[in-house]
């Protein structure tokens, strides 16, 4: 896809057209917000009920939770109160201890979405990460993920650790951590990688999933709406690349490809959605893309910054 091509996103037929063509930050971001708001409206009109959701944090930094809490339109409170019924999210749940995990177990007989961030440590039968204590017994991430995933209507991995292993599974990987799809040995999982995942992507994916079902995904299980185009194609510094004018050090305004930027090989929505509903994103802050949404991050994308040109 060339840099001047419009990105096309499949949306339902009732939106008057089968393709929604977007070529600007505003139009793409507007579509994502529409998806979340459409899900909320369906609940209000009684077309759909609020689906239960369990969000489990296993082994990782949980930057995805901080990212989610920074969502602005819709914000996380509106999302949780209007179109998903969040049963459990350890970082923000009021309940603690056995009471909290009991609610998780009670939800397993209902229709629910399972969201998970972090990788699963396998060493020593999973004892490197425990997520709860129940009836006097420690519940490992291995056990919890396997238990919750079994009856879930949909599974979404939030973040690169959950999706591909990410930093948690990076060398030397002393805990023998693996991604959720690898642990469960399933290929029907929706992956939303990112370090962290942008809340716009999470909100949009949840909105689409609750209103229309499984979105169109690429060969890695990532929704094409957010991972269907190279960062390079929408980068504000692309003109410098085309002119073969490259930055020599961090802080220069030119293309950072010679400094190790992975934008030309990384498929993500970053230049358009950006972060915190602002113009904030890595390249905009003079930091090369490190390819954090890909399956080889971080070991396969190092060094993140290099000097000395090509």
Regions found by a protein language model. Give the residues of each.
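Iron-sulfur-associated redox domains of electron-transfer enzymes in respiratory
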Residues: 10, 14, 18, 22-267, ...
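Intrinsically disordered, low-complexity sequence elements enriched in Ser/Thr/Gly/Pro
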Residues: 1-2, 26
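Long, low-complexity C-terminal extensions of enzymes
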Residues: 262-308
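Secretory targeting signals
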Residues: 2-12
